[in-house]
Design a protein with these regions (language model features):
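Alpha-helical transmembrane segments and their short interhelical loops
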Residues: 101, 106-175, 225-234, 380, ...
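Helix-loop-helix units of permease transmembrane domains in multi-pass membrane transporters
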Residues: 81-113, 360-392
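Short, highly charged, low-complexity non-transmembrane loops/tails of multi-pass membrane proteins
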Residues: 258-275, 536-542
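Short, membrane-interfacial amphipathic segments enriched in basic
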Residues: 1-12, 198-208, 269-291, 476-486
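Transmembrane helix-boundary elements of multi-pass transport/secretion proteins
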Residues: 4-7, 15-88, 120, 136-139, ...
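Transmembrane alpha-helix boundary and packing residues in multipass membrane permease domains
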Residues: 38-42, 124, 128, 159, ...
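Transmembrane helix segments
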Residues: 31, 38-47, 165-205, 209, ...
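Membrane-interfacial helix-loop-helix junctions in multi-pass membrane proteins
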Residues: 51-52, 187-242, 465-521
Length: 542
């Protein structure tokens, strides 16, 4: 028994070291729940709700953010890591070693469990130290049991998803596509509001809401008892058992398929040896080819399609709904649905141009693709311009999808000043793309690139009127938000979407700021991209 525990401990340590070397996993599973807690506390205000007992609003916010950290660490990113190991062959190679399969899976689940506990400790510890969150000794055993049970159950479900889906990109898209809507219907992001009855009922079908309520009741100062809620624990355990059964079945199916796989040899055609073109292509043809290539790169990556297109559309459907409905009128006469349609269009453009585009270039650099392209007649400006225009095409597709959803759900009409909306979106996308490429020339690896771009974009979204509106932030945050281009893009888009005439809606000051950032980013790219180290990552000196 002691030898088995030692083996499991070493495997957990191995998985934690691997996670530490993946900045994106660490940021999204540990840092983001804490960041969301801090930002939401600033948004809703940490007011004292009971001066006699010293209860503040953060007392009811911290448990939901801790639950969100657990599900992100144990469901989303355990599934993504397992799918990546399977696709690269690491899982197959580990299966050929004397390492027992239970230790292999147990190491991943144990690492995810510890990651979820760390995320919970950070949120609760920060809440207790800075926001007056009270921790009760009488409910700590119930909290620990709930966290362990939920972590194991979410891990089993994550493994099942990873084994059922064919690629890591599809796994990332599906897991996040599951977590985000369920988080909204599970009261994770709801503090002062009330969900529609159908959404509240739907939330009870999934285990996350049971965990949110378990932790919420354990930290509720007005309840007595030890915090053990057997009905919630049973619901979480039932989902875990179902996930484990599906994972076991999928694992056996995977082993059978691996043993049966054969790749038949293919013969080359004689026509492949003949050149398809006898003249040099025009610059227009080169640029069109790069634009088409950029769009194809996105369409072949399920996770990029989800975060750049599907996720903004999903938020347009969810955020207004949980805030009273998209037909609710704001102070300036605009509907909530129309406002968030404009902000989500800007968010989708930022994800496409500032996160996905430069990350793709960084991956191409690490794989040696950019180095090989440099040895061809393709001009560098054509490559980069094609990527920027491709990002603009994707941003327009996202805008079209948002318009369809807004029209169907809230009756949002097409903006009267649609030329201003299109011009603003195109300029904002170009600005985000150029700034992202400039950042790529400074950051050394693709994995770090994701952490830098996503780690700066999401906090700015909270203080730039993207996810929330009408919140008064401290002067420092206000000034910071107006310094970067995201808030100018958001304000220009919402102004254009709310204009009443076809010839209006142009926010020249905000457009000027976007143009200035674009020019500054272009200057950095012009200086840095030609001298950036393009050799494959494995050939660089450490």
């Amino acid at each position: 028994m002691s030898a088995d525990l030692a083996l499991l401990g070493r495997q957990v340590r191995h998985e934690l070291i691997a996670l530490r070397r993946t900045p994106l996993t660490m940021i999204l599973s540990i840092v983001f729940p804490l960041l969301f807690f801090v930002l939401l506390a600033a948004v809703v205000g940490n007011e004292t709700v009971d001066s006699r007992q010293g209860v503040r609003l953060a007392q009811f916010l911290a448990p939901s953010m801790a639950s969100f950290g657990v599900v992100m660490a144990t469901f989303s990113f355990l599934a993504a890591g397992f799918a990546e190991a399977r696709s690269t062959g690491a899982l197959k190679r580990q299966g050929c070693t004397p390492l027992p399969r239970w230790a292999l899976l147990g190491g991943r689940i144990g690492a995810a469990l510890l990651l979820g506990l760390i995320a919970t400790l950070l949120v609760i510890g920060t809440g207790a130290a800075l926001y007056g969150v009270q921790v009760y000794a009488r409910t700590l055993p119930a909290v620990l049991v709930a966290l362990v049970l939920a972590s194991v159950s979410f891990s089993a479900m994550g493994l099942a998803i990873a084994l059922l889906l064919p690629t890591p990109q599809a796994t990332i898209a599906v897991t996040n596509g599951i977590v985000v809507p369920i988080a909204f219907v599970s009261d994770t992001f709801t503090v002062n509001g009330t969900l529609p009855s159908w959404m509240s009922t739907l939330g009870w079908l999934f285990p996350l809401k049971h965990l949110v309520n378990l932790l919420g009741e354990a930290f509720n100062p007005y309840l007595t008892g030890n915090g053990f809620q057997l009905d919630h624990l049973a619901a979480i355990a039932a989902w875990g058992v179902a996930g484990a059964l599906v994972a076991a079945w999928a694992l056996r199916r995977e082993q059978d398929r691996t043993s049966e796989r054969r790749h038949p040899a293919r013969s080359a055609r004689a026509s492949d040896a003949r050149p398809r073109r006898t003249t040099s292509p025009s610059l227009v043809a080169l640029l069109a080819g790069q634009v088409l290539h950029s769009v194809r790169l996105l369409s072949r990556n399920a996770s990029s399609v989800f975060f750049a297109i599907a996720f903004p559309i999903l938020l347009v459907a969810l955020i207004p709904t949980v805030n009273g409905g998209g037909d609710q009128l704001m102070a300036d006469g605009r509907t909530l649905g129309a406002f968030f349609a404009a902000t989500m269009a800007g968010y989708g453009a930022a994800v496409t141009a500032y996160v996905n585009l430069p990350t793709g270039l960084a991956e191409a650099r690490d794989d040696g693709v950019l180095q090989r392209i440099r040895g061809t007649p393709l001009p560098a400006w054509t490559l980069l311009t094609g990527r920027v225009v491709g990002a603009q095409v994707v941003a327009l597709l996202t805008l079209a999808g948002i318009g369809v959803v807004g029209g169907l759900m809230y009756g949002t009409p097409m903006p009267a000043a649609w030329p201003a909306v299109l011009l603003t979106l195109l300029l904002a996308t170009a600005c985000f793309a150029v700034v992202g490429i400039a950042v790529m020339t400074v950051v050394r690896s693709a994995s770090s690139m994701v952490g830098v771009t996503l780690g700066t974009l999401l906090p700015l979204c909270f203080i730039s009127d993207v996810f929330v509106v009408g919140v008064s932030y401290p002067p420092v945050l206000q000034g910071l938000s107006w310094f970067f281009p995201l808030r100018h893009a958001t304000r220009a888009l919402t102004t254009a979407a709310g204009a009443t005439g076809i010839d209006g809606g142009f926010s020249w000051v905000h457009l000027g700021v976007l143009a200035a950032w674009t020019l500054a980013g272009t200057a950095v790219v012009a200086v840095r991209f030609s001298s950036v180290r393009l050799e494959p990552k494995r050939h660089r000196a450490s």
